[in-house]
Each structure stands twice: as structure tokens, then as C-alpha cells.
Amino acid sequence: FGDDQRVIDGPGVIEERIEGIRYRISPNAFFQTNSYAAPMLLSTVREFAGDLSDKTLLDLYCGTGFFAVALAAQAKQTIGVELVPDAIKDARVNAELNSLTPSNSLGRLPTGKAPMNGGGISFHDAKTEEFNWMEINADVVILDPPRSGMHDKALADIIAAKPARIVYVSCNYKNFAREMVELSKYYDIEAMRAIDMFPHTPHVELVTALVRKD
């Protein structure tokens, strides 16, 4: 469609409200394609993430902050990472729309700032395979990669970081099966649920809860 974007009429963005959470979405930013099934996806990820009290949540491939913004109030700190700059801008706006105070550091709020709800939240414009999350010590990681799956280095880094729990949201079960060959060496499947986000197609959104082996 080209790189030039011009708003002919209206605000140039759309807004969705999922389970009471407000989301602003720009034209180039990713958001869940099925707004009617999105609440089921969100509630499943929330369930599979478990108790986030006093925990650090890392949301990789976070898009406009669909999961991160909704779960941040329950966690000690939340970090979202996404390649697309427009999506990260939206994610920061979405945090503010929902009474969260985003920071520019790894979950630490600017001096003098305090979150109105939950813990600190920050969003970072970066490739997942190039983002250094080792210093984060994430307890729970949400993975929602594109249909092409995860970069091999990102997968290796996640395994090396040793989060206690991973919630993997996959729209391509073939790539998920390939990645599970490696993940299954270190993680057990605790639960799995398929959500029909793409009616009348052969595709489903597969959500899997993985727990670190003892």
C-alpha cells in the first residue's frame, strides 16, 4: 500500500474495549483480529499466567500491549517488547488510558512517578532476538510471535533466561510443534487450549501453559 499515510477524516486510529480495557490501535499496529473472541483469549492467558503477585511479567511480541496492559495491575512489574514502533507508541498510550504509568526503563518508574494501579510497566521498541532481558529475571513470559514463529536466538535466550512459567500463544501450530521440540527439554505442558479466532478457516489460536522442569 506504500509508506505514505494520510488521515482523510476522523482521528486516524480506532479504539477497542476488551473486558473493560481500552486499546488505541494505529493502522500499522498489530491487534487481535477477532474482537469477539479476544476476551476468551485474554481470559485464557490470564488464567494460564497464574498468580502474578510480586512477579515480573515479560510480554514478547506485545503489539499494542493487549496482554501486558490487561495484566499489569496484577504483577510487580511488566515489560513489553515489540518490533513495530507504531505499536509501541500505542502500547504506551494504552497504558495511560488504563491508569498505568509507563516508564522508559526496564519496569522502573521515573523518579517521582507512582503507578495508579498495579506495578511498573514499560514498553520497548526492539527485535525480540536482539533485546537483552537477562537482567529482567522474568518470572512469567508471554510469547505471541507472528505466524512465522520465533527467531532461533530468541528461543535460545528464553530457555537460557529460565522463567518459571511461559504462556505461548501460537497462530501456527506447525511452528509451535517445531519449537516445542526444544522447549520440551526444559518445560512441561501444564495446560493447552485452542481458541477459534479465525472462523471458517483451518487456523486456530493455540494457547499453552509451560512450567519449568524441576
Language model features by range: what are they?
Residues L109-P110, G149, V167, D214:
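Small/flexible residues
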Residues P202-D214:
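Core SAM-dependent methyltransferase catalytic element
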Residues F1-P102, G120-L143, S148-A156:
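Accessory RNA-recognition modules of RNA-modification enzymes
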Residues L106-G120:
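Short Gly/Ser/Thr- and charged-rich N-terminal loops/segments
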Residues S122-V204:
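S-adenosylmethionine
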Residues N98-T101, K113-N117, E182-L183:
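Short, conserved catalytic or adaptor-binding loops enriched in Gly and charged residues
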